């Protein structure tokens, strides 16, 4: 904690206000149960939030939870396709899809679907994927082998459903190329967040349908 304080808060008057404690699940549960901690702010998975929130509320404590997300974007027939593609790539592949604000579902009007998909596939194919320590790299590895294996498993499930998968090849170790999945319907696989660079693309006819698709997820 001393190193963190000196690096990020060099002018902090009361040094003990900031403390760093290393730990895992057991330490998190202890903090959730400890009534001396008035506000618990936790960042992690939805499962983590579901586990911690009842423990904090049981002692009438306050909780602030930054959890997962299954974010969607609707591309209308009037969209600037080139601008849309830039925004999609930025939102879907940054930090290798490992952030709660990652774009995971793309809902595209049928009249611009083919044009957008052509440009999007081209953009994905040109992504610099690999070693994060190289300046030219845009997409680095997943956090561990378990995450990489989970991504590959989900892509295999998508293929088994008859969906078309672009990308998703293993580059090396935990590094996997971002994937685009063209889906015919929003099944449970798509409704469940995978913390990885997988972008599901769905087609829509009218705005009401697009909004219904967008909102039909639990997250």
Enumerate the predicted regions with their spans.
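PLP-dependent aminotransferase-like
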Residues: 1-26
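ALDH superfamily catalytic-core signature
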Residues: 6, 33, 39, 47-185, ...
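Short, contiguous strand/loop micro-motifs
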Residues: 14-15, 39, 141-142, 197-198
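Active-site phosphate-binding strand-loop segment of PLP-dependent enzymes
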Residues: 17-48
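Short, conserved active-site loop motifs that form the nucleotide-linked donor/cofactor pocket
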Residues: 18, 162-163, 198-199
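Short acidic alpha-helix that forms the nucleotide-activated donor recognition element
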Residues: 29-35, 191-193, 212
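Conserved glycine-rich beta-strand-loop-beta hairpin in the small C-terminal domain of fold type I
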Residues: 137, 173-175, 192-198, 217-219
């Amino acid at each position: 904690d001393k190193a963190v304080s000196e690096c990020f808060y060099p002018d902090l008057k009361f040094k003990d206000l900031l403390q760093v404690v290393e730990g895992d699940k057991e330490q998190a549960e202890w903090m959730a149960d400890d009534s001396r901690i008035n506000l618990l702010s936790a960042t992690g998975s939805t499962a983590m939030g579901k586990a911690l929130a009842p423990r904090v509320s049981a002692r009438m404590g306050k909780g602030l939870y930054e959890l997962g997300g299954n974010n969607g974007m609707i591309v209308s027939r009037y969209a600037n396709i080139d601008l849309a593609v830039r925004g999609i790539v930025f939102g879907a592949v940054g930090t290798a899809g490992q952030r709660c604000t990652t774009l995971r579902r793309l809902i595209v009007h049928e009249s611009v679907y083919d044009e957008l998909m052509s440009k999007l596939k081209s953009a994905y194919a040109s992504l610099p994927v690999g070693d994060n320590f190289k300046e030219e790299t845009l997409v680095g590895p997943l956090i561990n082998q378990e995450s990489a294996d989970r991504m590959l498993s989900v892509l295999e499930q998508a293929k088994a459903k008859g969906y078309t998968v672009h990308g998703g090849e293993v580059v090396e170790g935990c590094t996997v190329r971002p994937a685009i999945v063209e889906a015919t319907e929003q099944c449970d696989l798509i409704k469940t967040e995978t913390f990885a660079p997988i972008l599901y693309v769905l087609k829509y006819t009218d705005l009401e349908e697009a909004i219904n698709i967008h909102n039909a997820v639990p997250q």
